[in-house]
């Protein structure tokens, strides 16, 4: 059956700021306390979406979350009206204010893990929400992510959206950032590659930075998504690269159809994995970048592998990269050599995503890949599909509500909270989502 890949990109939230919340993510740590520009950030993301849509790629949007997230502060014992709580936490525990104000939901590669209908035992598209258990600010996301996905993938005859795994370290799940699918045509059965950093009885794990994804979680997600057991491979990421800042597999590898583009040090038993894939995937091609051409540290600094690998109608592939790759002489030299060689990657497109990149999120972090047949695509909420009208409307929306300068101290401004809620109220109407945010369901009571 004919199917296409649709990229659902996350809209950057109004509280996008640099707080260094993500230990193991070196860009996040390095840019802590810098001044951010939320309006520029959301527009950089929108420009990427629109450019790819104009080039013929199917593109959609996923909204940001409600931030600052007052319900989490109430859970932590702060009381009073919303404004009183903001004032208290800013004075008593400002780090908590930053955590509940993170715009991290924009990196929707961590929103869920997707199984196309061609791979599922029941013939449905499955999406399992990620619990993001390793970081408090990200563990807040799952309930609203689930509500958003249910509002986008509404037709229960076509889609099954599963709640996140229990919030325990044993089942730490980071979503599609640790998942790749390989195969031929999108509509044909493929091989799903689940990548983990640790498993309970395996002492091989990183020493410096946490391994966020467990094998136990990956196995549970595969079961929830009803992936045919004959179409699954579980592989461990190289713990040494996790300790060099590769906190998700999509920082060191990306796949599309029959191609796996990765660093030669990406996986723990890479030769074994490559041989498995060669046996299981017709026409499989591994493009392994040697360390002598691009070091792991340069790959992390430029996000070479946190790229999008997209299929054109003629079967050739486009590699979508952050500008940092072009700015690095060695990486750019390698990329020009890559497109000149005999492989499906024949073109490169560079985008300026510096606002997201400074927090450790490149092109691949910003998108969730969902393979859909024509019938399934017609069942998706049409209001989220990118087109000229939506692009214009979202830019006008951003101009109205987003600030062009934000510091950690600004998060205590009650006006920012009100601006954010008003903006999301307008956005849910624009995208026909219904009442998906807690403030819409409670009337934002002052408690």
Swiss-Prot record:
Database matches in InterPro entries: AstB_sf, SuccinylArg_d-Hdrlase_AstB
GO BP field: arginine catabolic process to glutamate; arginine catabolic process to succinate
Pathway stated in the Swiss-Prot or TrEMBL entry: Amino-acid degradation; L-arginine degradation via AST pathway; L-glutamate and succinate from L-arginine: step 2/5
Keywords, ordered alphabetically: Arginine metabolism, Hydrolase
Binding site for substrate: 19-28, 110, 137-138, 212, 250, 359
SUPFAM superfamilies: Pentein
Record's catalysed reaction(s): N(2)-succinyl-L-arginine + 2 H2O + 2 H(+) = N(2)-succinyl-L-ornithine + 2 NH4(+) + CO2
Record EC number: 3.5.3.23
Active site: 174, 248, 365
Molecular function via GO: N-succinylarginine dihydrolase activity
One Pfam family in the UniProt entry: AstB
Family statement: Belongs to the succinylarginine dihydrolase family.
Function noted in UniProt: Catalyzes the hydrolysis of N(2)-succinylarginine into N(2)-succinylornithine, ammonia and CO(2).
Subunit structure: Homodimer.
Descriptive protein name: N-succinylarginine dihydrolase
Species classification: Bacteria, Pseudomonadati, Pseudomonadota, Gammaproteobacteria, Enterobacterales
Gene from which the chain derives: astB
């Amino acid at each position: 059956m004919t199917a296409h890949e649709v990229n659902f990109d996350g809209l950057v939230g109004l509280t996008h700021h640099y707080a260094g919340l993500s230990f193991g993510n070196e860009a996040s740590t390095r840019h802590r306390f810098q001044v951010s520009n939320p309006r520029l950030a959301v527009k950089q993301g929108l420009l990427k979406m629109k450019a790819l849509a104009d080039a013929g790629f199917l593109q959609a949007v996923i909204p940001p979350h409600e931030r600052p997230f007052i319900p989490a502060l109430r859970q932590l014992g702060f009381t009073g009206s919303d404004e009183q709580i903001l004032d208290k936490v800013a004075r008593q525990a400002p780090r908590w204010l930053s955590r509940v104000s993170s715009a991290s939901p924009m990196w929707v590669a961590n929103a869920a893990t997707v199984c196309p209908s061609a791979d599922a035992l029941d013939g449905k598209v499955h999406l399992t929400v990620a619990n993001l258990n390793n970081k408090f600010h990200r563990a807040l996301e799952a309930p609203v992510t689930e509500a958003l996905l249910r509002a986008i993938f509404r037709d229960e005859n076509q889609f099954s959206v599963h709640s996140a795994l229990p919030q325990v370290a044993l089942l730490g799940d980071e979503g599609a950032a640790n998942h790749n699918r390989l195969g031929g045509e999108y509509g044909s059965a493929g091989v799903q590659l689940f990548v983990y950093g640790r498993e309970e009885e395996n002492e091989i794990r990183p020493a410096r930075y946490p391994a966020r994804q467990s094998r136990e979680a990956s196995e549970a997600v595969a079961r929830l998504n009803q992936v045919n057991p004959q179409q699954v491979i579980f592989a461990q990421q190289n713990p040494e690269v996790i300790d060099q800042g590769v906190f998700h597999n999509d920082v060191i590898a990306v796949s599309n159809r029959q191609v796996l583009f990765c660093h030669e040090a990406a996986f723990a038993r890479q030769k074994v994995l490559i041989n498995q894939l060669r046996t299981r995937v017709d026409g499989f091609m591994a493009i392994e970048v040697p360390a002598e051409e691009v070091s792991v540290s340069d790959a992390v600094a430029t996000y070479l592998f946190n790229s999008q690998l997209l299929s054109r109608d003629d079967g050739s592939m486009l590699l979508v990269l952050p500008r940092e790759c072009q700015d690095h002489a060695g990486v750019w030299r390698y990329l020009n050599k890559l497109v000149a060689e005999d492989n499906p990657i024949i073109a490169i497109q560079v985008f300026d995503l510096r606002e997201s990149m400074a927090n450790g999120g490149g092109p691949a972090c910003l998108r969730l890949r969902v393979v859909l047949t024509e019938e399934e695509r017609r069942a998706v909420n049409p209001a989220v599909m990118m087109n000229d009208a939506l692009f214009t409307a979202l830019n006008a929306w951003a101009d109205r509500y987003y600030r062009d300068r934000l510091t950690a101290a600004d998060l205590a401004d009650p006006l920012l909270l009100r601006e954010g809620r008003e903006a999301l109220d307008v956005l849910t109407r624009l995208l026909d989502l219904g009442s998906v945010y807690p403030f819409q369901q409670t009337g934002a009571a002052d408690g």
